[in-house]
Amino acid sequence: MSQFNQNNKQIDVMGIRKILPHRYPFALLDKIVDWSVEDRTIVAQKNVTINEDFFNGHFPDFPVMPGVLIVEAMAQATAILGELMAETLFAHVVEKAGGGRRTFMLAGIDKVRVKRPVVPGDVLVIESRMVKQKNIICTAESVAKVDGQIVCSAELMAAYKDY
């Protein structure tokens, strides 16, 4: 991921598409607002609109973003952080990849708390921090906020795997 410069902290949706394999309807992030390999942190953004497919059934008269999709957006932000850190943290694994494609895949979710609904018009801001790494597994603490208030928090585990 050396193509992403530490001096330019923002990554647009086209840059996100270069990092993550996710595509519609599961590409859930619109922008990376800030990131730091040194601090092991990332801040991502999801603009929640009424046009999201999941609002057709969740719930038609009271549209609420499903908690599992909030957690998925948190996992995607964490995966991007992992990819941006891969050349330093996972150099031994990257070298063994043999030219194949690797990405971070969700391996575990702990301590999830959904504190309030996320609705159309909200801007979901996700903050993740890598707290532990062993071999190909990393653990991150992540929160999702709307208007500065935490709407969801979780501890996420991801594995750096071939796909």
UniProtKB/Swiss-Prot annotation:
Location in the cell reads: Cytoplasm
**Enzyme's top EC category:** lyase
Kindly provide the name given to this protein in its UniProt entry: 3-hydroxyacyl-[acyl-carrier-protein] dehydratase FabZ
Q: What is the lineage of its organism?
A: Bacteria, Pseudomonadati, Pseudomonadota, Gammaproteobacteria, Thiotrichales
Protein source organism: Francisella tularensis subsp. tularensis (strain SCHU S4 / Schu 4)
What the entry lists under InterPro entries is as follows: FabA_FabZ, FabZ, HotDog_dom_sf
Q: Matching Gene3D superfamilies, A to Z? A: Hotdog Thioesterase
- GO aspect biological process, one term: lipid A biosynthetic process
Is Lipid biosynthesis a UniProt keyword of this protein? yes
In short, the EC number is 4.2.1.59
Q: Does the keyword Lipid biosynthesis apply?
A: yes
Cellular component terms (Gene Ontology): cytoplasm; membrane
Active-site residues, Swiss-Prot/TrEMBL: 58
Pfam families attached to this UniProt entry: FabA
